[in-house]
Amino acid sequence: MAIVPERPSPRLLALISLITLATIFGQGSSSADESGASFWSPGTFANLAAIPGEPGWSFSATYFHATLMGGSNVATADTLPRFPRTTLTVQLDADIKTNVDLAILTPSYTFATPIWGGRLGFNLFIPVGTARTQIDALATGALGPIGFANQNSISDRLISFGDPAPQLSLKWNEGANNFMVYSRGGVPIGDYDPDRIVNLGDGHASWDNGFGYTYFNATTGFEFSAVSGLTYNFTNPHTDYQNGIDWHVDLEASRFLTKQFYVGAVGYTFNQLTGDTGSGATDGPFISRISAVGPEVGYLFPVGEMQGSLSLRGYWEFAAQNRSSGWNTWLAFSIAPTEKAPTVAK
């Protein structure tokens, strides 16, 4: 609906509507495609992150839900080609809401032969699911002497698969102390279209490397895990956009109340260290950061001769910059060869 102080022609109203929608599409694609989006999902690592697994195959299925809110503010001023003396000024205020529901399927294998005294593991993360984004925008401005205000809304939904991410990790155990190094890559074969508002694929390759530590006291049942890493993003060939280098830390502390049941707290921080580059980076460096905290609960149980686990954790995000924020929840089920740890002394 257009609201103007005068009664401009229908042709002018149509032009204003097109300008608003074009601006929404331009800004929406930037926000959902590259700016504020990252290959690494903060909160990926949590309980017992660095404890070596037992040799053999394992499998996990994680349900991930996120409700994110963001905003955008753009101001432009230009002349029209056919009317060089007429200046068009537009101020766009947009509210962006995104809902994401993913199933992350992860087959894994831990090798029995030690390497440098540690256990080598391979994981393949496969995300499938749906995402929906809605953008509500209000454009205000003036076309020459005529002021206008125009409100429009667009939305997009996608049900598909994202980029698979293979990972190699090496883990060591030294009593209560456990250590890990890992390397994970993003393979850009997920569903991606640079002209869509929402995508599950990134459209570019990524490489993340990091290390982790887990302290587990079998007597007290106290456990603490921290994992930190750096992400290098390759250039998106579709948009000539390259995200900057990201640094992330996942934190978790828990207490086993019984041999099987634990409660705890989780958190993460994500910081972009270098700015975005390329001809597609029309918003400039667009350095993003965010932090989060939340609760965690988990339960271990036998599945035949295997070890099953069920965990639930949630994150409330804050201190967001150039990135949508909100709540996200992880519900994970896994089955693996029986581990010697954790065993809580009672």
Q: What are these regions, as identified by a protein language model?
A:
Residues 178-184, 191-281, 292:
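Detector for outer-membrane/organellar transmembrane beta-barrel domains
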Residues 59-63, 122-126, 168, 181-183, ...:
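Membrane-embedded beta-strand positions of outer-membrane beta-barrel proteins
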Residues 78-81, 236-346:
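Outer membrane beta-barrel transmembrane domains
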Residues 55, 97-105, 137, 158-164, ...:
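Residues that define the transmembrane beta-barrel architecture of outer-membrane proteins
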Residues 46, 89-95, 149-155, 193-199, ...:
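Extracellular loop and loop/strand-boundary signature of outer-membrane beta-barrel proteins
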Residues 33-35, 48-56, 68-72, 111-121, ...:
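Short loop/turn motifs that connect adjacent beta-strands in outer-membrane beta-barrel proteins
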Residues 65-69, 126-132, 163, 172, ...:
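Transmembrane beta-strands of outer-membrane beta-barrel pores
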